């Protein structure tokens, strides 16, 4: 957590008032993120931003509907549709597939990155990732 706090401070990102989302909170966020991404990539990103801010900077408990609803609505998404997505099998299936892909790449957890045959873990690898993305873009244009 100290490393995350240091990076947040360096980048001017609020961080530190948190409620650990492990358990039901993670399940709720995965289900809503899966649903939001099916609506559009923009909706998925809007929910992710709202949820991350809520979890890591505002001490929102995403295992509780009152906090989850606030984060969904702040992302301009309809709560009733998001709530209906909770417990839907699609999110669990996608999470399992992602975990299998991570394992196959010899990775675990976040942040994990893969571009072609380049695989890396950790925010300290972001400069390498940026370089690989630039080279990949040049090779495909």
Please describe what each predicted stretch is.
Residues 38, 46, 50-141:
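C-terminal cap of thioredoxin/glutaredoxin-like
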Residues 1-55:
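Structural alpha/beta surface segment adjacent to cysteine/selenocysteine redox centers
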